[in-house]
Curated annotation (Swiss-Prot):
Cofactors, names only: heme b
Pfam families documented for this protein: Cytochrom_B_C (PF00032), Cytochrome_B (PF00033)
Phylogenetic placement of the source organism: Eukaryota, Metazoa, Chordata, Craniata, Vertebrata
Residue positions binding heme b b566: H98, H197
Gene3D superfamilies the UniProt entry points to: Cytochrome Bc1 Complex, Chain C (1.20.810.10)
Role according to the record: Component of the ubiquinol-cytochrome c reductase complex (complex III or cytochrome b-c1 complex) that is part of the mitochondrial respiratory chain. The b-c1 complex mediates electron transfer from ubiquinol to cytochrome c. Contributes to the generation of a proton gradient across the mitochondrial membrane that is then used for ATP synthesis.
BP terms from Gene Ontology: mitochondrial electron transport, ubiquinol to cytochrome c
The record's free-text note on cofactor binding: Binds 2 heme b groups non-covalently.
Alphabetical list of InterPro entries matching this protein: Cyt_b/b6_C, Cyt_b/b6_C_sf, Cyt_b/b6_N, Cytb/b6-like_sf, Cytochrome_b, Cytochrome_b_C_euk/bac, Cytochrome_b_N_euk/bac, Di-haem_cyt_TM
Gene Ontology MF term list: metal ion binding; ubiquinol-cytochrome-c reductase activity
Keywords: Electron transport, Heme, Iron, Membrane, Metal-binding, Mitochondrion, Mitochondrion inner membrane, Respiratory chain, Transmembrane, Transmembrane helix, Transport, Ubiquinone
Stated name of the protein: Cytochrome b
Family, similarity comment: Belongs to the cytochrome b family.
Residues the record lists as binding heme b b562: H84, H183
């Protein structure tokens, strides 16, 4: 019998078991495509980021000019930069949809996979934040100043911690240098965590839209889901390229076309769109430490979802009350995103506070209550 290299070679065997002969549920929908799309986003970001890093200079006097030089003088530098900047937006679109899928279908009951996923989200947010500082425009500088300053709310050690992170008494050259180092390093940490995430996932196998065990009805990953993933790649990459070519600055802030100036504060300091929901929660509490705790809680609350699952059914497919709550939560996050982009004025303050309260109420109180009620109604 001829030796099958794919199944016997030490390294190829790992790839084979993860991408070719992997038993997958026969009924997973397009919502299960976002994991592989996140993988493509990560590869795209690392490749474009590496090419950008070859031309970038991490110095306060040269950073802004080096980015301008890239866009003007480097072959296709403008395209590489636009793909990288907008690739970050697609990364977050995919991860938010991926998390939404996990919440809806009860995928969080694979606890290890879910917890590693939340750590991945936090790492991605850190990577995007330090990356946004690198072009050294006005919003880069002031965003870095405002967000790093939040750590000063930590009692007793806060101020020391902030000055240690800054490498001085304000955001300056040492800050930019270390942020570049971190922005280069963290994507590789994300790659490592992704492998851990996949390892845990392949221990249990994928969940499916019905939320029931699918061991009795599995199909090989290749060719069925490889072709399905390739369709997803084609759709997402065509959208990314369209955005990068037709409207590259649509999601950016015009303030970042002005070089960083510590003496001039922009009228509205706000992060990129993908952080606005958390920023709105931060702003809705009129106390620095309280705001920081709420900001942290807005993401860390995801760690609690497996513990708050009271339903006898895994998925929300057959749970209409939970479905209504879920879509209310989605609408609520969109409202928070919109409020975060608005100035701190009368209607927006109260809307932000109500939306922040609703966000935590739905996740921590209403989801478990609705699930318990549904158990009763369905006589489970």
């Amino acid at each position: 019998m001829a030796l099958n290299l794919r199944k016997n070679h030490q390294i190829l065997k790992i790839i084979n078991d993860a991408l070719i002969d992997l038993p997958a549920p026969s009924n997973i929908s397009t919502w299960w495509n976002f994991g592989s799309l996140l993988g493509i986003c990560l590869i795209t970001q690392i490749v474009t980021g590496l090419l950008l890093a070859m031309h970038y200079t991490a110095d306060t006097n040269l950073a802004f000019s080096s980015v301008a030089h890239m866009c003007r003088d480097v072959q296709f530098g403008w395209l590489i930069r636009n793909l990288h900047a907008n690739g970050a937006s697609f990364f977050f679109i995919c991860i938010y949809l991926h998390i939404g899928r996990g919440l809806y279908y009860g995928s969080y009951l694979n606890k290890e996979t879910w917890n590693v996923g939340v750590i991945l989200l936090l790492t991605l947010m850190a990577t995007a934040f330090v990356g946004y500082v690198l072009p050294w425009g006005q919003m880069s500088f002031w965003g870095a100043t405002v967000i790093t300053n939040l750590f000063s709310a930590i009692p007793y050690i806060g101020q020391t911690l902030v000055e240690w992170a800054w490498g001085g008494f304000s955001v300056d050259n040492p800050t930019l240098t270390r942020f570049f180092a971190l922005h280069f390093l963290l994507p590789f940490v994300i790659v490592g965590l992704t492998l851990v995430h996949l390892t845990f996932l392949h221990e249990t196998g994928s969940n499916n839209p019905l939320g029931i065990p699918s061991d009795c009805d599995k199909i090989p990953f290749h060719p069925y889901y490889t072709i399905k993933d390739i369709l997803g790649f084609a759709l997402m990459l065509s959208l990314l390229v369209s955005l990068a070519l037709f409207a590259p600055n649509l999601l950016g802030d015009p303030e970042n076309f002005t070089p960083a100036n510590p003496l001039v504060t922009p009228p509205h300091i706000k992060p990129e769109w993908y952080f606005l929901f958390a920023y709105a929660i931060l702003r809705s509490i009129p106390n620095k430490l309280g705001g920081v705790l709420a900001l942290a809680a807005s993401i860390l609350v995801l760690f609690l979802t497996p513990l708050l699952h009271t339903s006898k059914l895994r998925s929300m497919t057959f749970r209409p009350l939970s479905q209504i709550l879920f879509w209310t939560l989605v609408a609520n996050v969109l409202i928070l995103t919109w409020v975060g982009s608005q100035p701190v004025e009368h209607p927006f303050i109260i809307i932000g506070q109500l939306a922040s309260l609703t966000y935590f109420t739905i996740i921590l109180i209403l989801f478990p209550l609705a699930a318990a009620l549904e158990n009763k109604l369905l006589k489970l």
